[in-house]
């Protein structure tokens, strides 16, 4: 494990102004999300915290639950957004910049902008992936 560091706070030069009124959180579940189909994939995404979801309309990030049925592939692609895939359940193969990497529950995969990536569910249960994307 890496050396533990101390959190030093956030940069106070943020362009986001603190509002005068109390800011309330948005508390949602995957059932509150907005379903989305992706081209060339039989998997289903659910936009949970995302500009498209009026129940949790994030501005600078997106959290999407992605459900990939057994033996289904989400073909490789790339885009300008930065992402992190958190493998919550199941196992599969990710295609990352042309290389195949085995992934399973408990793994985190950080994808810089324009990094080619795809994922295949190689198991017999639904592969569940939490995707964090910025910008959404």
Language-model features: locations:
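Hydrophobic/aromatic beta-strand elements that line small-molecule binding cavities or substrate pockets
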Residues: 64-66, 106-107, 117
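A short hydrophobic beta-strand segment most commonly corresponding to one strand
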Residues: 65-66, 84, 110, 124-136
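Short, conserved beta-strand element in jelly-roll/cupin
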Residues: 65-70, 78-94, 132
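Short acidic-glycine-tyrosine-enriched beta hairpin
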Residues: 84, 98-114
């Amino acid at each position: 494990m890496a050396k533990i560091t101390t959190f030093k706070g956030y940069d106070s030069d943020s362009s986001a102004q603190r509002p005068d009124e109390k800011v309330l959180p948005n508390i949602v579940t995957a059932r509150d999300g907005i379903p989305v189909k992706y081209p060339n994939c039989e998997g289903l995404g659910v936009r949970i915290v995302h500009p498209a979801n009026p129940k949790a309309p994030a501005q600078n990030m997106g959290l999407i639950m992605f459900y990939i049925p057994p033996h289904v592939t989400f073909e490789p692609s790339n885009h300008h957004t930065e992402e992190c895939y958190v493998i919550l359940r199941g196992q599969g193969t990710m295609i990352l910049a042309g290389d195949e990497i085995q992934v399973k529950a408990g793994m985190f995969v950080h994808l810089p902008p324009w990094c080619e990536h795809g994922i295949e569910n190689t198991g017999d249960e639904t592969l569940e992936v939490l995707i964090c994307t910025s910008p959404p």
